[in-house]
Amino acid sequence: MAANKGMAIGIDLGTTYSCVGVFQHGKVEIIANDQGNRTTPSYVAFTDTERLIGDAAKNQVAMNPQNTVFDAKRLIGRKFNDPVVQSDMKLWPFQVINEAGKPKVMVSYKGEKKAFYPEEISSMVLTKMKETAEAFLGHNVTNAVITVPAYFNDSQRQATKDAGVIAGLNVLRIINEPTAAAIAYGLDKGSHGERHVLIFDLGGGTFDVSILTIDDGIFEVKATAGDTHLGGEDFDNRLVSHFVEEFKRKHKKDISQNKRAVRRLRTACERAKRTLSSSTQANLEIDSLYEGIDFYTSITRARFEELCADLFRGTLEPVEKSLRDAKMDKAKIHDIVLVGGSTRIPKVQKLLQDYFNGRDLNKSINPDEAVAYGAAVQAAILMGDKSEKVQDLLLLDVAPLSLGLETAGGVMTVLIKRNSTIPTKQTQIFTTYSDNQPGVLIQVYEGERAMTRDNNLLGRFDLTGIPPAPRGVPQIEVTFDIDANGILNVTAMDKSTGKANKITITNDKGRLSKEEIERMVQEAERYKAEDEGQREKIAAKNALESYAFNMKSAVGDEGLKDKISESDKKKILDKCNEVLSWLEANQLAEKDEFDHKRKELENMCNPIITKLYQSGCTGPTCTPGYTPGRAATGPTIEEVD
């Protein structure tokens, strides 16, 4: 497949599900995967024989919970000792280890212990999305726009970009999910005059509220707020806890320590939750959930709403906060846009509607697909798409957190305020604190607190060689420059000497080095080749099996009774049975072994079948077009990844 230089895709890399779209022929296509689903679970599973990504990974999670990795987005760009990582680790069935301060996921793959960075897991999901798009478009795709929550800090954005590189993508830009949804919305509406839009994005794992102004094709993010740990999974957890208690009451047994039982229960709870968005009651039927006990139960919508009442009500706090940040009254909001699968929950919609005094909510865009839709449009814009639908769109994003440096006494001096439109550049003059000070330490922080110790250190560097002078005399010009991806460059220059030093905020926060990314790219290629090898192996096994069965049924055919001697018939049947029992015992043999066995079987059967031809036989093996020695090549049914 040749790459199409002018085509770029938009990927919504979600905590629980991902989605990919492409802008072509003047409209966005959301692309279905090989299972026919327009969203793909952000799951990667490792087994003794293969690696599975997406639906195939999620479908086997109950049998293999320790080696099925999800929620990589909760780990990406974070340190191991981050409180979020520490609290989430208690809930995950897979193991997370600490390697030089960074979290890695430990799994067993092909009988060996392997540890992966979150970037590598996310890159596998991105590879799946890339392949989904390539299968649809019929050519290679390398250019992509990837979305992240508005709340992601610099290191999380950078790590997401790295994941794209490992997956073999050229990441044109990282954009905020609500911004992407606004683009989708702007295209849908063809806006006239300035409109204030509130985007309420409640997905599988994160919750974001953003306020944007759309005016004449220009999008500006006015404020963002949210909760990095609220979403559909939390509602599932409430249901799981509820049913674990119910099981205890009914059967006097605690299933909470049995990972497989909990996982099966969780799958049923997720299904019940979806049902409750359109029905007022859902039934759960799980056969042999624990110690042979069948669990049949039901739940009403009202009970579900009660179980999650505090979580649902809590979604309004970020709405209020973003309105305060944008200095806007709720009456000034023109449109309320729902994004994310969890916004289908009727109670969530009702709370939001009541808060906005009964205003209609905008549900015209499929909430699961809005973000990928907008990312696909943005990808087309960046590739210079000339379609009038996208021509007039301009995109202004914001810095999610204030950026600044430490000054005397550990004070946070802000250069770029939170919610500033990016790209942006700010310069300020600083000076020395003591006489004849030869250098200054520039320490860069992000956060909203007054003291740097309460904020997040991004990086530090020294500017040395300042000529001796009394305190307060030297002039040091510090520039903060954020590009469109939200990546920060900080420069400090001594104005008297012109001497300067700079830092690009990446590495200090645990960004992967070039070498590590290079290694991961190669490993990703290797895994892809292994996956390919696995598919070929299965094809060879199936070919051998179907050939053996075909031969058995051919020689057992009534019409051939007189045409084939008993000894020949016995020879073929014995050999076929021998091959089939070898197959039973050697399911994991190599491709070459399967091919070799088939050759062996063909060499024995071909002369006998050829003899039949020459004797002018009739029957299934003698129909025109039947080639001896060729396995049936009907559709191969196998577990797809």
UniProtKB/Swiss-Prot annotation:
Binding site for ATP: 14-17, 73, 204-206, 270-277, 341-344
UniProt xrefs under Pfam families: HSP70
Region (Nucleotide-binding domain (NBD)): 3-388
PROSITE patterns linked: HSP70_1, HSP70_2, HSP70_3
Domain of life of the source: Eukaryota
GO CC terms of this entry: cell body; COP9 signalosome; cytosol; zona pellucida receptor complex
Entry-linked CDD domains: ASKHA_NBD_HSP70_HSPA1
Keyword hit for ATP-binding: yes
GO BP: any one term: spermatogenesis
GO MF annotation terms: ATP binding; ATP-dependent protein folding chaperone; heat shock protein binding; ubiquitin protein ligase binding; unfolded protein binding
Chain spans, region Substrate-binding domain (SBD): 396-511
Tissue specificity of this protein: Expressed in spermatids.
Keyword list, A-Z: ATP-binding, Developmental protein, Differentiation, Nucleotide-binding, Spermatogenesis, Stress response
Domain remarks: The N-terminal nucleotide binding domain (NBD) (also known as the ATPase domain) is responsible for binding and hydrolyzing ATP. The C-terminal substrate-binding domain (SBD) (also known as peptide-binding domain) binds to the client/substrate proteins. The two domains are allosterically coupled so that, when ATP is bound to the NBD, the SBD binds relatively weakly to clients. When ADP is bound in the NBD, a conformational change enhances the affinity of the SBD for client proteins.
Family, per entry: Belongs to the heat shock protein 70 family.
Quaternary structure note: Interacts with PRKN.
Protein purpose: Molecular chaperone implicated in a wide variety of cellular processes, including protection of the proteome from stress, folding and transport of newly synthesized polypeptides, activation of proteolysis of misfolded proteins and the formation and dissociation of protein complexes. Plays a pivotal role in the protein quality control system, ensuring the correct folding of proteins, the re-folding of misfolded proteins and controlling the targeting of proteins for subsequent degradation. This is achieved through cycles of ATP binding, ATP hydrolysis and ADP release, mediated by co-chaperones.
Identification of the protein by name: Heat shock 70 kDa protein 1-like
